[in-house]
From Swiss-Prot:
Pfam families linked to this entry: GDC-P
Family, per entry: Belongs to the GcvP family. N-terminal subunit subfamily.
Keyword Oxidoreductase (UniProt): yes
Keywords per UniProt: Oxidoreductase
Species this protein is from: Desulfotalea psychrophila (strain LSv54 / DSM 12343)
Any GO BP: nucleoside metabolic process
Domain of life: Bacteria
Catalytic activity: N(6)-[(R)-lipoyl]-L-lysyl-[glycine-cleavage complex H protein] + glycine + H(+) = N(6)-[(R)-S(8)-aminomethyldihydrolipoyl]-L-lysyl-[glycine-cleavage complex H protein] + CO2
Name of the featured protein: Probable glycine dehydrogenase (decarboxylating) subunit 1
EC number assigned by the record: 1.4.4.2
Oligomer and partners: The glycine cleavage system is composed of four proteins: P, T, L and H. In this organism, the P 'protein' is a heterodimer of two subunits.
NCBIfam families with a match to the protein in the record: PRK00451.1
């Protein structure tokens, strides 16, 4: 819709209709001290040519992955996107489709989402998967709310301090105006969640553990599940790197009741951090409390296989006060992209890619340790890891930017007690020669300090 400002004649005509002589007369009920005085500092209009030049100048300030080597993950990972994905997803049948309310004219969209659910359920080892949330953070927050619906009178959720800080912030935002309570569980010397205090928490509805966690450490999900169930709480397993489960035992196999996390690694670009795709699944017995939509398989009147929305507990389907979620249609395109990615690689491809990521991170870690870096934690890691250096790495990090290398995320901003610690990540997009060159540059800049 275009915005065309009113002409003076139109303004006068409207004032006459409402019986006012001027705009000041129209807004006389607003005290003079509350009105903005002076001109609004809006620049003059630009021609089309000038506008294109203006945006070109703004775009030139951007820094993109293709021009840099980025050794940072922390919830947003640089993975190769097969060319078949943008080709398929650009088809108007998928790209412009809205909520498939009429299954008779939306079988393609519904089947695409159904296949996403099936592949995600296999990856995560769970019974049922919904048609996606906004991102990993909202999926975790919705999982916490889901656990409260199931546990009824219990009002507390325990979150591991090793869960992505942004995820924990979103959960806190969801719960801040409620009577629900969040308790943070500490991290032990190995970088894993310390569950020793669970028995002393009253009204515990659920416990959320991320694996691999924010530090890249692989949690003992099997052991966590047993301890959580021992205190009669629901086990929420979350993740920020879905690819890890191409190599690791799935959360469902480890006893997780609710599984949630970020699927950005599966065919979605980083794009300033979004859009993501919130993966979410649960056990069959909990499915009626799961938010969002589920696409189900059925038979039509002629006995042919078809797909329909089922258990659609969104506020636009049922009464708002009974709804479990208000996640909207735009996530369907992201879910379908993730489904196409999994179908393109297949189980073997995802497993091989996960192994490649593990090996790249292990090689980078070993090379940095040779420079004197000390691992923050000794537990097994996937894709990323935390280190401390015997020299001023912040200065080295700034110098590397001049070489188009973005290396290491300072953990101090998220964990003040981890001053001088940095989080690194390596994926399949980082070649061995890239790693060797970057390590040599770090060594060169570190020696300049001595």
């Amino acid at each position: 819709m275009r915005y065309l400002p009113h002409t003076e004649e139109e303004i006068q005509e409207m004032l006459e209709v409402v019986g006012k002589e001027s705009l000041d007369d129209l807004f006389s009920s607003v005290p003079a001290e509350c009105r903005y005085q002076g001109d609004i500092p809006i620049p003059a209009a630009l021609t089309e040519w000038q506008l294109k030049d203006h945006f070109a100048a703004l775009m030139s300030k951007n820094r993109v992955n293709q021009e840099h080597k980025v050794l940072i993950g922390a919830g947003s990972y640089d993975h190769y996107v097969p060319e078949i994905l943008p080709s398929l997803m650009s088809r108007s049948e998928f790209l412009t489709a809205y909520t498939p309310y009429q299954p008779e004219v939306a079988q393609g969209t519904l089947q695409g989402i159904f296949e996403y659910q099936t592949l995600t359920a296999r990856l995560l080892g769970t019974d049922a998967v919904n048609a996606s949330m906004y991102d990993g953070a909202s999926a975790l927050a919705e999982s916490a709310l889901m656990s409260f619906r199931i546990a009824r009178k219990k009002k507390t959720v325990a979150l591991s301090a090793a869960i992505h800080p942004h995820y924990r912030e979103v959960v806190a935002t969801y719960l801040q105006a409620t009577d629900f309570t969040i308790i943070e569980l500490p991290v032990d010397a190995e970088g894993r969640t310390d569950l020793s205090s669970l028995a002393g928490i009253e009204g515990l509805a659920s416990v959320a553990i991320q694996s691999p966690n924010f530090f890249g450490v692989v949690e003992d999900l099997q052991g966590c599940g047993e301890k959580i169930h021992d205190v009669d709480a629901l086990f929420i397993s979350c993740f920020s790197e879905a690819l890890a489960y191409g190599l690791l035992k799935s959360p469902g196999e480890c006893g997780a009741d609710i599984i949630c996390g970020e699927g950005q690694s599966f065919g979605l670009g980083r794009s300033y951090g979004g859009p993501g795709v919130g993966m979410m699944g649960c056990r069959d017995k909990l499915v009626r409390n799961m938010p969002g939509r589920i696409v189900g398989q059925t038979l039509d009147t002629k006995g042919k296989r078809g797909f329909v929305l089922t258990l659609a507990t969104r506020e636009q389907h049922i009464r708002r006060e009974k709804a479990t979620s208000n996640i909207c249609s735009n996530q369907g395109i992201c879910a379908m992209t993730a489904g196409m990615y999994m179908a393109t690689l297949g189980g073997t491809g995802i497993r091989q890619l996960a192994r490649l990521n593990y090996d790249k991170a292990a090689y980078l870690r070993s090379e940095l340790i040779k420079l004197g870096a000390k691992p923050l934690f000794d537990a097994p890691v996937f894709n990323e890891f935390a280190l401390r250096f015997p020299f001023d790495f912040e200065r080295v990090r700034e110098a590397l930017k001049e070489e188009s290398v973005v290396a290491g995320l300072s953990l101090e901003a998220y964990y003040p007690d981890l001053q001088g610690a940095y989080l690194f990540c390596a994926t399949e997009t980082l070649k061995k020669e890239d790693i060797d060159r970057i390590v040599s540059s770090i060594k060169k800049h570190a020696l300049q300090e001595v």
